[in-house]
Amino acid sequence: MLLGPASGSPSPLLASLTLPARPLQPPLDLKHLLAFHLNGTTPLSLFPNFSTMDPVQKAVISHTFGVPSPLKKKLFISCNICHLRFNSANQAEAHYKGHRHARKLKAVEAAKSKQRPRNPTTNGTVVSSASPPASGSPGTPQSKGPASPPLGPSLQLPPTPDPSAGDPVHSAGDPVHSELCDAAASSSSSSCPPCSPDPSREAPGPEPAEGAVGSGVNGEGRGEKGRLYCPTCKVTVNSASQLQAHNTGAKHRWMVEGHQGAPRRGRGRPVSRGGTGHKTKRVIGNRGGRQGPSPPFHCALCQLHVNSETQLKQHMSSRRHKDRLAGKPPKSSSQHNKLQKHTALAVSVLKSKLALQKQLTKTLAARFLPGPLPTTAAAICALPGPLTLRPAATAAATLFPAPVLGPALFRSPAGAVRPAAGPILFAPY
């Protein structure tokens, strides 16, 4: 160890020695170790080559290091007409192109068209007849005569055609059209001379009349559609033939008579729809059927209505009708009465069987095995070696008395039951 005076300057010997210098350790900082910035908010700032990465790596990195995006509300696509909700636009598009949506849409449009107020037919006729002549077509040639002053808005009507032409539309005599023509003639007589019939203006005359006829037909069709409904039965039909068939049917007559529900159709049961009157209504209501009431097939004695003469003959030859003629009371052929009879018979049979069983058990219990059981076992053990059934007077008398079981049942057979064997010793336990 070298000792020297303590001085501020280093000694030359120490300066000549090469000592390893200790590196200064700054505080540990992750920012110097990592190749990316920690303060970045997007994966692009963390990874410089993010744009050149594989799409799968991009998705993983953006899912791991990316900023969580705010939750987006899921958009629901729904159909208000069919009351359905879809998960995607493809499902919605397929539904809108389908038959179900088209049918619902047609039904809604039909209901809306029925709810719209209908204009009166007279106003439609006046407008349709007055509008075409007012707006003259540019292609029609004008007459060469002097131009007459224009008529008022209420007087701009097509001139009446020549009666020799025989127009079927105007020969019908529309009252509104005739009144307007009279008013036009009376008012224009003082203001302008009567105009000569112009062929260019006569041409569009029948068209508005035809339009008026068409609108009248449409109005009648709508009214007829509104009438295809039976308020009594609350039934709507599609055509007049269906409505007529419904009015002649049994259900409609049943509801008209004031009954509730549908008529019962029972075979052989009395029907409360009436006799002669019912048949008369049915024949009159039929289209092109026989006129006059048909003969009623009715048995007054049995209060029964049938449909044909053959059924009436079969009823007359039946036992039910003959019993009524003989004065016998009617037999109730209901299933309830039959079941009651069967159950009563079965109960009586069971009661008799139970009584017999009780009596037999009492008799056997009183007469069977009168002595104690050890005495009977000792008597059996006292029998000889071969097991042969021999009549024993005392045993037979004690075990089976004469009135119940006679000794003839216990006769010994001709030979032994089995070959001779050694003696058997009965040892309980």
Swiss-Prot record:
Q: Which organism is it from?
A: Mus musculus (Mouse)
Q: What is its main location?
A: nucleus
Indicate yes or no for the key word Nucleotide-binding: no
Gene encoding the protein: Znf385c
ZnF region ranges: Matrin-type: 77-107, 225-259, 297-327
Which Gene3D superfamilies does the UniProt record give? Classic Zinc Finger
Coiled-coil zones: none
Give the start-end ranges of region Disordered: 109-224, 258-295, 311-340
Q: Report if keyword Nuclease is assigned.
A: no
This entry carries the following GO cellular component terms, namely: nucleus
InterPro entries recorded: Matrin/U1-like-C_Znf_C2H2, Znf385, Znf_C2H2_sf, Znf_C2H2_type
Q: Where is the composition biased (Basic residues)?
A: 262-284
| Molecular function in Gene Ontology | nucleic acid binding; zinc ion binding
- Which portions of the chain have biased composition (kind: Pro residues)? 147-162
Q: Which UniProt keywords apply?
A: Metal-binding, Nucleus, Repeat, Zinc, Zinc-finger
Name by which UniProt lists this protein? Zinc finger protein 385C
Q: Which stretches are tagged as biased composition: Low complexity? A: 125-146, 181-193
Tell where it localizes.
Nucleus
